[in-house]
Structures are given as C-alpha cells and as structure tokens.
Amino acid sequence: MPAEQQRWAEIAVDAAGDAQEIVGALLLNTTGCQGYATTATTATGYLPVDERLENTLLALKSALADLPRAGLAPTVPDITIRFVAEADWANAWKQYFKPQTIGRHLVVKPTWEAWQKRPGDVVIAIDPGMAFGTGLHATTRLCLQALENHVRPGVTVADVGTGSGILAVAAALLGAAHVSATDVDPLAVRIARENVALNGVTDRVDVAEASVPPTGTFDLVVANILADVIKDMTPALFAALTPGGRLIASGIIDTRAIDVADHLAASDFADLTTSREGEWVAVEGVRSR
C-alpha cells in the first residue's frame, strides 16, 4: 500500500491595514510555519497536522487576542483553518505571486512564471522561498521605485535586511557597480545568495550575515525593515553612507512616518521626503555631513 500522505493545515489570519505587519510577524514567529504568503488582507501559513498543532494554534490565538489590549489591532483577527494534502501544500502559497510591473521599467517575476520581455524591461527573477512568501509587500514596491529613481551606473548600494535579496538584485540590474547586502538571518542570507546567482549578478553583489556592511561607505543605503529598527540603527545607517549619500527607509506604517522622519532629521539627515502605498510609507533622506 502507498504511504499515507502528510496532511497540512493552512492557517489564514485577517491582516488588513495597520495590523498587517504585526499579524504576519506573529504568524511566522509563533507557529514557525513552513510556508508563508500575504495578500492585502490576509497572512497565510502552513503547518503539519501532528500532535503539536493544537498547542501551536492555541499559542497563536492567545498572541492575537493580546493585540487589541496592546493597541495594535482594533479587534482580535479572525483565523480560518483549511486542511490540505502533502501534494498540494508546497505549491499552494505560490498562487499569490504573479509577475508585477513596478515603476517605469522594473518587472518582478517568480521563477515558475513566464514573462515576455519588452523593450526597456528590467526583469528580476525571484524564488523567495517559503520562508519569505510572495516577497512583494507594499514596502518592497516603494523601495524598488526609489531604487529605480536613484540608482545610476557606477553607484554603490547597501541593502540592510535584505531578506530574499530582491532589492540588492534590483540595484545591480539597474546599474550599481557594487551592492553589499546584509541580514542577521542565516536563512535569508542563503536565499538571497541563491537569488543573486539566479539573476547573474554575483560579480556585483555580495551577501553577508550581519546587521550592516562591516566596511565601506555607500552612495545609497536601502533599509526595508521596521520603524523602531530604523530608529535604533540610524547611527549605523548614517555611518554607512558617504556624505551626500541617500537613505531609503521603509517598513514604516503611516502612523509612524512622522516619528521616523523627525528622528532622521534630528540625526543630520536632510532633504527628507516620503512616498506611500496604502498604509505604508518610505522615507528618504540625505546624509548632510
């Protein structure tokens, strides 16, 4: 008889608006899910159906119940559970990731989707891995648009908190002479290196397990992380820039944008500007000295 297939639980959590970032983080960190995807309204993860599932779900529900009390969500996010077979789950999350045109010329496509390249297209092929889901959050798109606006042939770029490596790859394909990508997560480092190789830019992009590049200064620093992390890392981000260099910071919910911008202004960043998509904001500033 054929072996019985492993069953998986598809856990979908409401994650709209201001709560999206924290709900996604709770789903990943509380459950350790082995597949992850997001849409504008939902965060979805996949867990094996085993003796640990019940306790894992109880822990997730408890963490979500704390969000309104902490002022992080208006109500307790709803959870929907669906069971899928082994043959289905590994590819189920991929349905959310389709080719997207971003800015004027950038196209981000998953490795499993075809794309007919048009004149002027800069095509970024990404396999984000299940740990990084679809990889095209609004903050990623904001950073990609900013890179398209500011990367010129020959510039140097640092990508702090690189994740899947998408921003580092984009900078290289847009003409950067050198890109230094860093992440404190060893899994991110591995996946980013794979995506760098996939796009043929290993000669211009290096990926290291670190919070910021340990040496050198850069014309552009992009940091798509979190508002509080950006504030904590401001001295290091400032030091990583050449005088007159530009910081592109995102991962910022709109309710925190003024706070982050004021902090950067007080830290000798000038010419501050913001861009936004939905509830998410990118803040740019220039090192003034």
Annotate the PLM regions.
Residues 244-257:
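ADP-ribose/adenylate-binding Rossmann-like module
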Residues 8-118:
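N-terminal auxiliary segments of SAM/dcSAM-dependent transferases
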Residues 130-214:
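Conserved SAM/SAH cofactor-binding pocket of Class I
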Residues 124-125, 158:
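Conserved beta-strand elements of the Class I
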Residues 221-223:
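Hydrophobic beta-strand segment of the Class I
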Residues 270-289:
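Core SAM-dependent methyltransferase catalytic element
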Residues 187-191, 229, 256:
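Conserved short alpha-helix immediately C-terminal to the canonical SAM/SAH-binding motif I
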Residues 231-246:
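A short glycine-rich, Lys/Arg-flanked "PGG" loop and its adjoining helix->strand segment in the class I
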